[in-house]
């Protein structure tokens, strides 16, 4: 790789703001620690925003889409045409994330990195066309070096757009038939875990389908001879355009000082790639939920992440992260708007 912008320094957290927020928490009209994880979230957001009283009014959601050549191996319950059809649904307002974005008053950006329909042209979609999906990684590398660079940069560009628009929180979502297979393959390399422990039903495979999926991944990993110490090679060989873009977006956000709320299994794999490329970015990543894919719990543990929700979700699209936004907003509201003991004339210690 000739360009290594992802190694550039990430923004530091504001320790003074965190100290001020921590001190404020001790003065609010409640027993210390009684709001549990919400208190820690408010303090963390204070450090990320550099404000004693953080807010999350401006939320930017970007969906990255791309098709996967490995679908040729019969690893998905749905045909590849669904990826392009869902792009229409996103901008048409009918997808789950479209509804959630409206309810949250969040911006929604849709980026097509490369679907099988090279002629697809939809108003409201950024068509980058890095290829008609990735190559079948069971037989050859998924991406060329140029495609990988372009996908990472596409994510970085999305992060920069969000920062320029004043976003206080960035959510990346994904759409791509076959992408749980790519994510499981990447996680298998980076975590050193058997594919059988990380492969799940995705969009609805039965047990035999999940077993076949794991076998396809194991065969591909033997073909490519990948090492955990080289996450970029792993990303190029068995990843996806949208997974690379997510990793680029997370790194770009950390460098620009925009907090990231990571969605489910696929997004967590992208987060792991980002952290392996630049460990400084980890401080900027919050994790929304633990999903239904069996490998997600292992991933979260590797990232030392405490997810906010556990609802059995496996939709993707950034939907789980969007569902966690009200929780973060309420954490900020409680922190910023509750009275202190002095303001409320309430005794600050037991009798």
UniProtKB/Swiss-Prot annotation:
Active site: 317
A GO molecular function held by the record: nicotinate-nucleotide-dimethylbenzimidazole phosphoribosyltransferase activity
Reactions performed catalytically: 5,6-dimethylbenzimidazole + nicotinate beta-D-ribonucleotide = alpha-ribazole 5'-phosphate + nicotinate + H(+)
EC number(s) from the headed UniProt entry: 2.4.2.21
SUPFAM superfamilies cross-referenced by the UniProt entry: Nicotinate mononucleotide:5,6-dimethylbenzimidazole phosphoribosyltransferase (CobT)
Gene3D superfamilies: 1.10.1610.10, 3.40.50.10210
Pathway membership: Nucleoside biosynthesis; alpha-ribazole biosynthesis; alpha-ribazole from 5,6-dimethylbenzimidazole: step 1/2
Pfam families the UniProt entry points to: DBI_PRT (PF02277)
Keyword Glycosyltransferase set for record: yes
PANTHER family the UniProt entry points to: NICOTINATE-NUCLEOTIDE--DIMETHYLBENZIMIDAZOLE PHOSPHORIBOSYLTRANSFERASE
Its job: Catalyzes the synthesis of alpha-ribazole-5'-phosphate from nicotinate mononucleotide (NAMN) and 5,6-dimethylbenzimidazole (DMB).
NCBIfam families, per the entry: cobT_DBIPRT (TIGR03160), PRK00105.1 (NF000996)
Family: Belongs to the CobT family.
Record-given protein name: Nicotinate-nucleotide--dimethylbenzimidazole phosphoribosyltransferase
Organism the protein comes from: Pseudomonas putida (strain ATCC 47054 / DSM 6125 / CFBP 8728 / NCIMB 11950 / KT2440)
């Amino acid at each position: 790789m000739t360009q290594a912008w992802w190694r550039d320094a990430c923004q530091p957290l504001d320790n003074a703001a965190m100290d001020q927020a921590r001190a404020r928490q001790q003065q609010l009209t409640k027993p210390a620690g009684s709001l549990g994880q919400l208190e820690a979230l408010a303090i963390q957001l204070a450090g990320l925003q550099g404000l004693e009283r953080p807010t999350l009014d401006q939320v930017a959601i970007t969906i990255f889409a791309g098709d996967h050549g490995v679908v040729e191996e019969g690893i998905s319950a749905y045909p590849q045409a669904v990826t392009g059809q869902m792009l229409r649904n996103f901008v048409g307002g009918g997808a789950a994330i479209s509804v959630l974005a409206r309810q949250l008053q969040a911006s929604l950006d849709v980026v097509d990195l490369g679907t099988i329909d090279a002629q697809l042209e939809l108003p409201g979609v950024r068509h980058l066309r890095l290829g008609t999906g990735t190559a079948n990684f069971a037989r050859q590398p998924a991406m060329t070096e140029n495609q990988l660079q372009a996908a990472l940069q596409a994510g970085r560009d999305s992060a920069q757009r969000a920062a320029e628009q004043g976003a206080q929180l960035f959510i990346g979502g994904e759409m791509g038939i076959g992408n749980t297979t790519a994510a499981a393959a990447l996680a298998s390399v980076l975590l050193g875990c058997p594919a059988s422990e990380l492969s799940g039903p995705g969009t609805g495979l039965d047990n035999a389908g999940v077993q076949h999926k794991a076998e396809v991944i194991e065969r591909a990993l033997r073909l490519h001879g990948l090492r955990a110490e080289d996450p970029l090679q792993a990303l190029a060989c068995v990843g996806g355009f949208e997974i690379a873009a997510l990793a680029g977006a997370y790194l770009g956000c950390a460098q620009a000082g925009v907090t990231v709320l990571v969605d489910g299994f696929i997004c967590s794999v992208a987060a792991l790639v980002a952290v392996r490329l630049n460990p400084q970015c980890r401080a900027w990543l919050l994790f929304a939920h633990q999903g239904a894919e069996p490998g997600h719990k292992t991933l979260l543990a590797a990232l030392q992440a405490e997810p906010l929700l556990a609802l059995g979700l496996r939709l993707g699209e950034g939907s789980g992260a969007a569902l966690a936004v009200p929780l973060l907003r309420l954490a900020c509201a409680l922190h910023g708007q509750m009275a202190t003991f002095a303001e409320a004339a309430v005794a600050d210690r037991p009798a």
